[in-house]
């Protein structure tokens, strides 16, 4: 036994260096250097990865997930404050996915969008990018005057709330966002109209390269603005046509339902705990049966009241859907009017282009007619020159013996050329190639 143990220990001691040699890095491999591979920069070894184009991945991650400045407008007190919140905190606070918050990122260019979620409304309308909840509005802090005006105007309206105004807070915030976006787009359309019509009138009277270049830039701006207005119009129209999306935006009612359901569940849990306590403490006696019946009636009345509250909340939600639809319809009319302005301006530009093309075609036709006349005259003169050249050759003929014979040849050739030219003109008129 001792010999076997000794041999086993010797075998294990012999295997240990081999295992250590297999697991660790071989010393001769570590000493080999490859001259063809460049050495990695310190940032790539320690901090993170750097791509050949100079792209710093850690900095991009910090930039994407860093804190942002938000303007918070509270519904209850109408107070305005600035918050520094990162993206993950905002997602947990409003229960929004990352793709919804990406719509509000100023680094990305997204079309106008209005999304109704469980606890928030995501609004991306031109410069106004915000998250509307039942209790607050979180607006991306920006130096844009429209953003600051939106926050100030919302605070003013919350402080000066009219007595007959029954709209929930989220609808009022959404209304102000629609008003700001529609006003901004309408102002840009009006500015474009003021600049476009005089320029187009000048172009019809004087066609020049400078005027054509100005009209080209104007048309590019018009197409871009029309696309933005059309997207806002389509977004409002899509909301108006879908009752489910409008009901999803009624955040105050959903909050009341959640609170009522929570308190109702708490009451039912309290009743069950009391019932369980009486059943375990003592057997049910005939004296305690009225108490149990009263508790049962109370539970039934609680369920009935919850059912009635849900039913009344459904009726209230239907009324508010109609109010939201009327609100959206009002701004749909405004944005549709702006779109009609831009459409009329585009039609005016198209008419001006058609008029210019007609003028250019007319000038081109005149040039072609002049070239045709010039070619015909050149042909007649060439005939006259051929005759004169023939008689100018050095050969003997009886014509040269007659006095003034060469002059008569020239006169006759000219008359024949004139008749040929008149014949061509008559042919052009007959074929309607030239208005003569």
Curated annotation (Swiss-Prot):
Keywords: Coiled coil, Ion transport, Magnesium, Membrane, Transmembrane, Transmembrane helix, Transport. It comes from the Eukaryota. This is Magnesium transporter MRS2-B. It is a multi-pass membrane protein. The chain crosses the membrane at residues 372-392, 408-428. Residues 1-14, 29-54 have a biased composition (Low complexity). One of its GO terms (molecular function) is magnesium ion transmembrane transporter activity. It comes from Oryza sativa subsp. japonica (Rice). The keyword Magnesium applies.
């Amino acid at each position: 036994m001792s010999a076997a143990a000794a041999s086993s220990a010797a075998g294990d001691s012999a295997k240990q260096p081999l295992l250590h040699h297999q697991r660790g890095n071989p010393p001769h491999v570590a000493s080999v250097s490859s001259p063809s591979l460049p050495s990695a920069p310190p940032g790539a070894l320690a901090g993170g990865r750097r791509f050949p184009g100079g792209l710093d991945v850690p900095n991009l991650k910090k930039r994407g997930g860093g804190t942002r400045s938000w303007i918070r407008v509270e519904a209850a007190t109408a107070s305005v404050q600035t918050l520094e919140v990162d993206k993950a905190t905002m997602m947990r606070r409003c229960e929004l996915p990352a793709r919804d918050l990406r719509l509000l990122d100023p680094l990305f260019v997204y079309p106008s969008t209005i999304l109704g979620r469980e606890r928030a409304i995501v609004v991306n309308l031109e410069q106004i990018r915000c998250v509307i909840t039942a209790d607050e509005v979180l607006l991306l802090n920006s130096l844009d005057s429209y953003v600051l005006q939106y926050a100030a105007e919302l605070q003013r309206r919350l402080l000066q709330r009219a007595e007959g105004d029954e709209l929930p807070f989220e609808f009022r915030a959404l209304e102000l966002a629609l008003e700001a976006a529609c006003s901004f787009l309408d102002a840009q359309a009006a500015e474009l109209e003021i600049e476009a019509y005089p320029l187009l009138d000048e172009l019809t009277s004087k066609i020049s390269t400078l005027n054509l270049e100005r009209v080209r830039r104007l048309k590019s701006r018009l197409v871009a603005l029309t696309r933005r207005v059309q997207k806002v119009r389509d977004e409002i129209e899509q909301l108006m046509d879908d009752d489910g999306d409008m009901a999803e935006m009624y955040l105050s009612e959903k909050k009341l339902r959640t609170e009522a359901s929570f308190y109702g569940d708490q009451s039912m849990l309290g009743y069950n705990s009391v019932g369980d306590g009486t059943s375990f403490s003592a057997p049910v006696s005939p004296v305690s049966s009225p108490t149990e019946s009263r508790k049962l009636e109370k539970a039934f009345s609680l369920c009935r009241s919850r059912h009635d509250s849900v039913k009344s909340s459904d009726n209230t939600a239907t009324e508010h859907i109609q109010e939201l639809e009327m609100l959206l319809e009002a701004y749909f009319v405004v944005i549709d009017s702006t779109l009609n302005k831009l459409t009329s301006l585009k039609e005016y530009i198209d008419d001006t282009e058609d008029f210019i093309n007609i003028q250019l075609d007319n000038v081109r036709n005149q040039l072609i007619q002049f070239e045709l006349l010039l070619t015909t005259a050149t042909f007649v003169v060439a005939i006259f020159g051929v005759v004169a050249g023939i008689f100018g050759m050095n050969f003997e003929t009886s014509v040269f013996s007659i006095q003034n014979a060469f002059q008569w040849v020239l006169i006759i050739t000219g008359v024949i050329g004139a008749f040929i030219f008149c014949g061509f003109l008559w042919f052009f008129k007959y074929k309607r190639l030239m208005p003569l």
